[in-house]
Amino acid sequence: MEIDNQTWVREFILLGLSSDWCTQISLFSLFLVTYLMTVLGNCLIVLLIRLDSRLHTPMYFFLTNLSLVDVSYATSVVPQLLAHFLAEHKAIPFQSCAAQLFFSLALGGIEFVLLAVMAYDRHVAVSDRLRYSAIMHGGLCARLAITSWVSGSINSLVQTAITFQLPMCTNKFIDHISCELLAVVRLACVDTSSNEAAIMVSSIVLLMTPFCLVLLSYIRIISTILKIQSREGRKKAFHTCASHLTVVALCYGTTIFTYIQPHSGPSVLQEKLISVFYAIVMPLLNPVIYSLRNKEVKGAWHKLLEKFSGLTSKLGT
């Protein structure tokens, strides 16, 4: 019975970013505004793509998936974080912690695979423009999107099951903003080298493999761009990929820094800041990046705003 009591913990205490009340209130206000802007921005991107027939292309189909992933990821972390800023007892039940870990891992994995798929899409658009529609047909796009969602979910299910089978003893204080993988593994009172090895393998399979595919796609894209004779043609081809390349650099960079070397990786504070960036900043940046650096999206925004202003003018008269 002693072992069973040590193995299962009913709830965890999240230590969060700060214990100072004024700091928590300030962070609550900042994160609430950021979260609402994230939900609004990504939902508007999805709505815009849905309403504008010019955006019914493979690139924007995958961007729709990416926006849904971003909103879901932020929602898996931020509401609980906001609630804990205002709560005196910052507890999270065992089942909720496991669910949060599963969804955050799954959605993160899905995003990595989606970014690799989007890189392939950009490669085809630049390198094989004439056959783009034939190659990136609806059936292939659907299969690639499903592969992204399934692979991320399966990896997360395995990692979550392995992690929550570890004996946690009496230690229930998670020094993090959420039930993050490395933070939960650190609670175990047994040797976790096998779990860290599993994290490493998982990171290589679901993080480095898509990353290598992204690199390969961009090597071929750059090779094609350099062969374009006109300066205007090279500029147009580069702008086709600029938004995606920016998101790839931000997304993969922070996660590789966190997970590829668990022993010699970032400090606990750095892990918290990286998680804040990934859960709060990145989902907000994605729609901004794709809107500001994409002429088609900006054109669709202007068209939608013109329709809206015309409608309000008619209603006003």
UniProtKB/Swiss-Prot annotation:
Domain of life: Eukaryota
Cytoplasmic compartment segments: 50-57, 121-139, 220-236, 293-317
Main subcellular localisation: membrane
Segments passing through the bilayer: 26-49, 58-79, 101-120, 140-158, 196-219, 237-259, 273-292
Cysteine disulfide partners in this protein: C97-C189
The keyword Chloroplast appears for this protein: no
Any one GO MF annotation of this record: olfactory receptor activity
Gene Ontology CC: one annotated term: plasma membrane
GO biological process: detection of chemical stimulus involved in sensory perception of smell
Cross-referenced PROSITE patterns: G_PROTEIN_RECEP_F1_1, G_PROTEIN_RECEP_F1_2
Membrane topology: Multi-pass membrane protein
Assigned keywords, A-Z: Cell membrane, Disulfide bond, G-protein coupled receptor, Glycoprotein, Membrane, Olfaction, Receptor, Sensory transduction, Transducer, Transmembrane, Transmembrane helix
Location of the protein in the cell: Cell membrane
Sugar attachment sites: N5
InterPro entries, sorted: GPCR_Rhodpsn, GPCR_Rhodpsn_7TM, Olfact_rcpt
Intervals, Extracellular compartment: 1-25, 80-100, 159-195, 260-272
The keyword Hydrolase belongs to this UniProt entry's keyword annotation: no
Similarity annotation: Belongs to the G-protein coupled receptor 1 family.
Functional summary from the UniProt entry: Odorant receptor.
Protein name: Olfactory receptor 2F2
Gene expressing this chain: OR2F2
